Amino acid sequence: LAAQGRYEAALEAAVETGKRFAVHNGGNPALVAWRSQAALCLHALGDTAAAQAYAHEELELAERWGAPYAIGHALRVAGLVSPMPDAVKLLERSVEVLRASPARLELAYALVDLGTRRRRQGQTAMARSLLQEGMDLAQRCGADPVVKEARSELRALGARPRRSYLTGPEALTPSETRVAGLAATGLTNRQIAQRLYVTVKTVEVHLSN
């Protein structure tokens, strides 16, 4: 819902999820981070105070539970709904926590969010480094929306985003991985195309990458 811009409906859904979760599972934010979702929706709707209240409540709970992913995520959301310079401090803490965790995708989000705010501060070199790292990590995770956001921010800096340095299986998109896997079994391009419901040309393009 939030991705469609339906923030009021998304907020209502998040709060309702929170009520049900509290009845059955308690308050572990690592399981359902509904307060973070509510905070982002409220921020988009212009209710900054309520957004920050939800975000910091989730951060307190995350720190109580101690799971690095939950803490890093809560710090990132708190940074997104906070004014400068608090936003940068919170996002820096998020990156620090997530670097020590296996949560690679959440780290990619945090790096891009921090890089975006560094760009707004005019710290171009630092912003470029953060955004490029976040983009490379997002590419590993197959997170195209994060990659696009990072590229957009890099272009806003006047930088030309470099192509991913990744090689081998990590450099492949999910679609390319599926095609390569089928090709490795000995199927022809036409057979692969029929199996995946794509054109032979699409298969050829994937195998050429």
Ranges and model annotations:
Residues L1-Q4, L31-L45, G72-M84, Y109-R120, ...:
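Tandem amphipathic alpha-helical repeat scaffolds
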Residues H43-G46, H56-A100:
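Alpha-helical adaptor scaffolds
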Residues D113, R155, R162-N209:
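Helix-turn-helix DNA-binding segment
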Residues G5-A9, F21-Q37, A62-R76, L98-A110, ...:
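Alpha-solenoid helical repeat architecture
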Residues A13-V15, F21, Y54-A55, L91, ...:
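Inward-facing hydrophobic residues that define packing positions of alpha-helical scaffold repeats
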Residues H56, A125-D144, R155:
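TPR/TPR-like (Sel1-like) alpha-helical repeat modules
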